[in-house]
Amino acid sequence: MNKLLSFAVAAALSLGGVASVQAAEITGAVGATSQSGMTYRIGAGWNWDKSWWESSTGRLTGYWDAGYTYWEGESDHSSAQHSLSFAPVFVYEFGHGYLKPFVEAGIGVSVFSSTKVGEQDLGSAFNFEDRLGLGVKIGETQRVGIRATHYSNAGIKQPNDGIESYALFYSHSL
């Protein structure tokens, strides 16, 4: 398991070099699951470079998000899991100043290394990812916030316990 974790960390760190050429931002997140386990996520985002409903209140925009999450297991690490996810995310930014509060929401897909995460049985490795977050955009290069993410297979296969992750995140534009 340590070799797998080392490989995942090395891959995530090398993602930064690749992503700097093509991605608009790199995101790191640390969170806890609904089962009290820890999660660690690294992701890359590509801004849509479009906005809708622009007004003095703010604007609607969005980005594509791809990420890798390490789901910490028991103390022996034998129950640790990994997941890859991809989602379109809509963002509403309030205001036009240096600090812009925002809310975000998205629904995407994910694939897990196992159907069990802690005590939760997801029923299948393929799951949907629903997210809701809020935070502050700092200038044009940084975002910090909190995010709740729910994973389940939408009843495609039973059991479908689902699992949630609640995380603090930081994003930096490249």
Question: What does each model-identified segment do?
Answer:
Residues 42-44, 88-90, 132-134, 168:
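Membrane-embedded beta-strands of outer-membrane beta-barrel proteins
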